[in-house]
Curated annotation (Swiss-Prot):
It comes from Synechococcus sp. (strain JA-2-3B'a(2-13)) (Cyanobacteria bacterium Yellowstone B-Prime). It catalyses: a ribonucleoside 5'-triphosphate + H2O = a ribonucleoside 5'-phosphate + diphosphate + H(+); a 2'-deoxyribonucleoside 5'-triphosphate + H2O = a 2'-deoxyribonucleoside 5'-phosphate + diphosphate + H(+). Coiled coil: none annotated. This is Nucleoside triphosphate pyrophosphatase. Its EC number is 3.6.1.9. HAMAP family: Maf (MF_00528).
Length: 197
């Protein structure tokens, strides 16, 4: 039997992915201070951040649950790009991304509080960016959307206008690779499809 799933994230996009897949869950953000963890390696960074978020939430549970933590960054030209701190930086990054290919990394952490088991993995998706004009970039930043997204774009929102194509898991670019999460659940002896019955 599948224990209750707790999503340790404030991300509306991650919530929507789970909801669309018919997976019941509850949200409990970790409010973890991401500045505590630093790394120049995107794989290490997203896995450590996802794990830290999941650990904070797992420690607060009083019943057996599965805690899912996630964190995403865009890796472009040797630079790790998380959420931009302000509109000016968002514009700079979007200009930098024009016509480039970036890699979107998402760390996935899964904690089974009943078995006291922890898994951490990552997914990577290549993102091929379009060449928006300065005017289009300013209009996009003015919507506020890129200020809430790793890498300054939301492929499931207005930012989709500026992505030519991707190679890899689409959900990963949104914030959660459901195929990877399914495999992680299986590794712990659970099936996400049990949530459908």
């Amino acid at each position: 039997m599948l224990p209750p799933i707790v999503l340790a994230s404030q991300s509306p996009a991650r919530r929507q992915l789970l909801k669309a897949a018919g997976i019941p869950f509850r949200v409990q953000p970790s409010y973890f201070d991401e500045s505590q963890i630093k790394s120049s390696d995107p794989v290490e960074l997203v896995q450590k951040l996802a794990s830290a978020k999941a650990e904070v939430v797992a420690a607060q549970q009083r019943e057996p649950v599965l805690v899912v933590g996630a964190d995403s960054v865009l890796y472009l030209d040797g630079e790790i790009l998380g959420k931009p701190p302000n509109a000016l930086e968002a514009e700079r990054r979007l200009r930098q991304m024009r016509g480039e290919v970036g890699e979107l990394y998402t760390g996935h952490a899964l904690i089974d509080t009943k078995q006291n088991r922890r898994l951490t993995h990552y997914a990577v998706t290549r993102v091929f960016f379009a060449k928006p004009s300065d005017e289009e970039i300013r209009a996009y930043v003015a919507t506020g959307e890129p200020l809430n997204c790793a890498g300054c774009f939301a492929i499931d929102g207005r930012g989709s206008l500026f992505v030519e194509r991707i190679e890899g898991c689409p959900g990963n670019v949104i914030g959660l690779s459901l195929p990877l999460l399914r495999r992680m659940m299986q590794e712990l002896g659970y099936s996400l499809t049990d949530a459908w019955s």
